[in-house]
A protein has these predicted regions:
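Hydrophobic "anchor" residues on beta-strands that sit immediately upstream
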Residues: 87
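Hydrophobic alpha-helical transmembrane segments
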Residues: 1-82, 90-109, 117-144
């Protein structure tokens, strides 16, 4: 039983390592199965990030305007997860912008190629800008 509880701890640490920039170094061997199993702890990592952002928001709002608080919170959010979600949003939007040729196999291959490309396209950049703007506006609205 002790070995299983240690595995759960490993998986929890892996989820934080994957979804945040919190420096958790794995001092054990990590298998593909371990990485897959860590997904069960993704909500925990998300709740932790949400707690940090909520406490930061409440604290900052005591000292700054809602506009400045919103901007700082968006910055903390991006820094906390290393822009991981924005990169995924950008890649997805770029892939969805690939025009269809009618050949499903070819279109799928092209979309996967675009998603794998490290360059950000116009649609991806627009999606990032809109996502950041909307996050800022939603946070600002909380304190009006």
């Amino acid at each position: 039983m002790k070995k299983n509880s240690f595995k759960f701890m490993e998986w929890a640490f892996l989820s934080f390592q994957f979804l945040t920039i919190i420096p958790i170094k794995a001092k054990w061997s990590v298998s593909e199965n371990d990485i897959a199993r860590s997904a069960m702890f993704f909500p925990l990592a998300g709740a932790f990030q949400g707690l940090i952002l909520s406490l930061s928001c409440l604290t900052l709002n005591l000292f700054f305007s809602s506009s400045l608080t919103g901007g700082i919170i968006v910055l903390i959010y991006i820094l906390l997860n290393g822009g991981f979600h924005l990169d995924g949003l950008s890649d997805t939007c770029d892939a969805l912008s690939v025009k269809s040729t009618g050949n499903k196999a070819y279109d799928r291959e092209q979309r996967l190629r675009v998603m794998g490309d490290s360059a950000t396209g116009a649609i991806g950049a627009t999606a990032i800008c809109l996502a950041i703007l909307l996050k800022y506006l939603f946070i600002k609205e909380l304190f009006v």
